[in-house]
Amino acid sequence: MAQQQSLDVLVIGAGSGGYIASIRAGQLGLKVACVEANPYADPKGEPRPGGTCLNVGCIPSKALLSSSEEFEKIHKHALAHGIRVAGATMDVPAMIARKDAIVTKMAQGIEYLFRKNKVAYLKGQATILGRTDGGFRVAVTRSDSTQELTTRNLVIATGSLPRELPGIEVDNVDVCDNAGALDLRSVPRRMAIIGAGVIGLELGSVWRRLGAQVTVIEALPQLLPMCDADVAREVLKLLTAQGMDFRFGARVTGLERASDGSLGLAYVDAKGTADSLVCDKLVVAVGRVPTTSGLGLETLGVKTTQRGFVDVDAQCRTSVEGVYAIGDVVRGPMLAHKAEDEGVMVMECIAGQAGHVNYDAIPSIIYTSPEVAWVGRTEQELKDAGTAYRTGKFPFTANGRALGNGDTSGFVKVLADQKTDAVLGVHIISTYASEMIGEATMAIEFKASAEDIGRISHAHPTLYEAIREASLAIGTGALNL
């Protein structure tokens, strides 16, 4: 075993939370190392930083969503703009190569940032060995060596893995999880997706745009229960109109492979009737589970929940002093930016500062077309809490920029406290909703009122004017409706 190194903080995991935490530690002058053992190998076969988000999640999915959207624009929308395109085809291997190049470039960028901020980047499997005077002992194992480290503080940032579905074995050839669905080399004629959550909808959107017949099987009786009900209904209407087939209240019972290579997916529908469908590719997108096993957390007595999450307080402290956990391994939404915020907070706390995350002001986004974005409370949550509120809505059919873009689908919905007018929630369905939700997030973070938003000058013509109009609708009334 190699000689010990002594650190101020060791971060286990170089995903969104872990690498940002490590960089912030370096900025604060802490002696920091970050360990990564993920299976997403770089061209040299070494573990690559970035975690799920960079390697098989946020970034590659957005690359494919962008490519597939460009393809659909050419085929379905170009003529409306006076553009005539004949015979356009999709080179799927070239599309995948573009995606891979983006991932590689960003992974190299993270390693550069580690060097810039004096973060020791260690590639190997971290195992917690136990306590030592004033800290903890951790072994980092590679195929040919083991290095022991001591550290005053420990940050668990090991992310999550796709949830397995009993009886459905993922091979990432015909039966895929998110990683496999982002790496197909041809467009399947028929694709079935188990799970109508964010991952299922985004992956389904990619391959539907390229020509696949997409059927989504969902055990719940409705789409996107975490969304505002108005938003969920509108999303279902729009995606159905685009050609996605949804089957709700369906429970998968088995999978069979036919001699022609097709897959037969058996399920029981909402009425309890046995049914089945045939597909060429199956995507399993039934959620994710925290990655906490094999780390040695039990060696220190770190408490976990019944669902396997590390139990933490508001500042991501675990039950063991000096041990923190962030990102997908702790409570809350599995979002890259939430993990990043927690990483910054934890390092500032370790450095003696007042790190903080406002969990009421973390935006969520679904990158379908149109996009869906929200921050703050839904109308259902306000009703359940007994909070008196007012609602303002504004449709993009009355927005000049949306008309010019050729896509007027969706709306903005603003929820404000009935007494104080404080903005409690903002929900958007629109092209570029992901770029508009920032204003709403800032409004909630700084406790702005709907009137505040309504009195701020918004550039014209823009899509985000609709946020102002929806805010005005709560009070004196929208100006353009």
Please identify what each model-predicted range represents.
Residues 3-17, 187-197:
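Beta1/beta-strand and adjacent pyrophosphate-binding region of the FAD-binding site
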Residues 10-12, 126, 148-159, 193-194, ...:
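Short hydrophobic core segments
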Residues 171-188, 276-349, 435, 454:
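FAD-site-proximal beta/loop scaffold in flavoenzymes
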